[in-house]
Curated annotation (Swiss-Prot):
Keywords: ATP-binding, Cytoplasm, Ligase, Nucleotide-binding, Pantothenate biosynthesis
Location (main, coarse): cytoplasm
Protein name per its UniProtKB record: Pantothenate synthetase
Binding-site positions, beta-alanine: Q64
GO cellular component: cytosol
Gene (name only): panC
Lineage of the species this protein comes from: Bacteria, Pseudomonadati, Pseudomonadota, Alphaproteobacteria, Hyphomicrobiales
């Protein structure tokens, strides 16, 4: 299996996409920060089903990290990533430098309202501004017909959809199911930070969220269901809970019982912050 072609300039990216367009080919994109795992590969497989050509960006975006977060520690392993991209037959890897994405004098930020309110934004107030800005740039650079994002980062998926609607970006946003290990833990590049004991605790997160979702579907009051989930997470060994909340699936507005919903959570194990979400069936 051969590795995909690698380009690190916007000009080279646009030239390749233009060649595909001249041949009448549909183009999909999967934005990533590298440190690829099976969750990412599942997104690329979906992209390959939706289009004849697939661009995967690998860029650790500094604007979505707060000063106290793990930008410097975030795993960077391009050679391994390219080998994995070969397995799923990605056509092009776009690996820009920070200087190429944010050259001297760069002064624009995109702020998305609506689904960005609360949840992650309460604890990472600059995160979605960084996400929206880099995603808009990537879409303008690659001009994909569609892009695939995982439901594991559910609020991010909703924010990207809002971004494309509001700015008339002609990109179809495809949400992909969360990929989990055999014990139900959502796959994440940050799982590599966990030791064996922490992994055992981390695998309780999905179980506890499913119990909360089932309780909500059965008629339990929101505060009772999410409060019990908070207590269960602490009892399981999580040191701190940032949030456990029920929101409407489409808008992330506060959940109403007659609407499809999601239970979303963020919790800490040592220095590692984990997020996950599960759906709440309509009653």
């Amino acid at each position: 299996m051969s590795r995909p072609e690698v380009v690190n300039s916007v000009a080279a990216l646009r030239a390749q996409v233009s060649d595909w367009r001249r041949d009448g080919l549909r183009v999909a994109m999967v934005p990533t920060m590298g440190a690829l795992h099976e969750g990412h590969l599942s997104l690329i497989r979906i992209a390959r089903e939706k289009a004849e050509r697939c661009v995967v960006s690998i860029f650790v975006n500094p604007t979505q990290f707060a000063p106290s977060e793990d930008l410097d520690k975030y795993p960077r392993q391009l050679a391994r990533d390219l080998d994995l991209l070969a397995r799923v037959k990605a056509d092009l890897a776009f690996t820009p430098t920070v200087g190429a994405m944010y050259p001297a004098g760069f002064a624009t930020r995109i702020s998305v309202g609506g689904p960005s309110a609360g949840l992650e934004s309460d604890f990472r107030p600059t995160f979605f501004e960084g996400v929206a800005t880099v995603v808009a740039k990537l879409f303008l650079q690659a001009t994909p017909d569609c892009a695939v994002f995982g439901e594991k980062d559910y609020q991010q998926l909703c924010v990207v959809r809002q971004l494309c609607r509001d700015l008339d970006l002609p990109v179809e946003i495809i949400g992909a199911p969360t990929i989990r290990d055999a014990h139900g833990l959502a796959m994440s590049s940050r799982n590599a930070y966990l030791d064996e004991a922490e992994l055992a605790v981390a695998r309780r997160l999905n179980v506890i969220l499913h119990k909360a979702a089932a309780a909500l579907a059965a008629g339990t009051h929101q505060d009772d269901a999410t409060g019990e989930a908070n207590r269960a997470l602490i009892a399981a060994g999580f040191q701190k809970i940032d949030y456990v909340e029920a929101r409407e699936s489409l808008t992330l507005a506060p959940w109403r019982r007659d609407r499809a919903g999601r239970v979303l959570a963020a919790a800490w194990l040592g220095k590692t912050r984990l997020i996950d979400n599960v759906d709440v069936p309509v009653a």
